């Protein structure tokens, strides 16, 4: 099988040296992602496209899906590469490829040509289009908005029959811009803002301020791992968890009610800036949107920014909540965000929307900054790829099995889309579908006399969810890894 990767248009308008660097980085990213599926595949870069060739036909859909999620790719063409002799030969090959698709449909032919030939692209379009129209009686030519567009590419003596076109996510390849640290909470905003910076070519590390114990951290780890695995797995990134409960306790005890929200955000920015400086990261990323909550007015945002020299990026600053939720739905984080535990440890009864710098600084003089230094020093930093391994250690009490007994039921916790694409069928045992984001509310409705074997494709989500259910008091869960 063969795929032609078309570059994001903004890459093609760069200078020659920058364009070549971007293409080289994108080629490396594609190799890093796809080597997990087929170690024998070849990735070859050209001036205006990248070729991916693989032998394992069983991995075709998986490879195609992975390519649509790599930043820097505008679209992917799945092609059949064949030699040709003349225009009539092109027509005959197109007829074999497209006959079934064109039955009863309107169509047009679009051709791109590279190399020296005694015909033009328009000549091929007319010849092939006329031939298809004559040989498929129920088909009809329509040049604007046809039901089917027959895409052909001619390069020297090779014909590329386009079997399918699939849109990528665009943007710049990860690694073409500098690293950033995303302040991730697991909600709608921070997930979308992290994705937007990945799409713009940044390697995104994650910093999580834990206000709610193990269950909260498990949920946020799931979101961070999902974002990395889906859009940024070409690079290693860090997941830094900071236990912020001592800081919250100090704020609740010593800070005036109306100033709590702004001061908490200032403490988070101070802590994140220290982490960023430690690892050489150039900027922080937050999901703040103008006016969404009291701490996100221009006055308050300016005061929050003042505590650090580190650049703070807010890609969602002008977005409304509906737009953010729609983006979360597109990238697959909506269900995580909807079921994420809410921990509002610092809730002011009358939060200020226009904080005064002198008052904020006066309140912060009451704060013991050694507490902040200590929680940053004790921050837990892991390679995001180790989240799965670390979860294995944490869920020692949850048994992992590769077989099943008479009282066992497999619980497929993948998302609905994944279940529809690859239904799970295991001979000799019932399989029940319950997406991971419904476990917290629906698992208790299942037959608790059964032993439930949680399963997902890579085993990360099933382990995290097993730990979560154990914490909720459900002891009839195991992890299924055949």
Swiss-Prot record:
**What metabolic or biological pathway is this protein involved in?**
Cofactor biosynthesis; thiamine diphosphate biosynthesis
Per the record's keyword annotation, is Transmembrane included, yes or no? Answer: no
Report disulfide bridges, numbered on this chain.
344-456
Domain Rhodanese residue range list: 404-482
Which GO-annotated molecular functions does the record name? ATP binding; CCA tRNA nucleotidyltransferase activity; tRNA binding; tRNA-uracil-4 sulfurtransferase activity
What's the domain of life for this entry?
Bacteria
HAMAP family per record: ThiI
Query: What name does UniProt use for this protein?
Result: tRNA sulfurtransferase
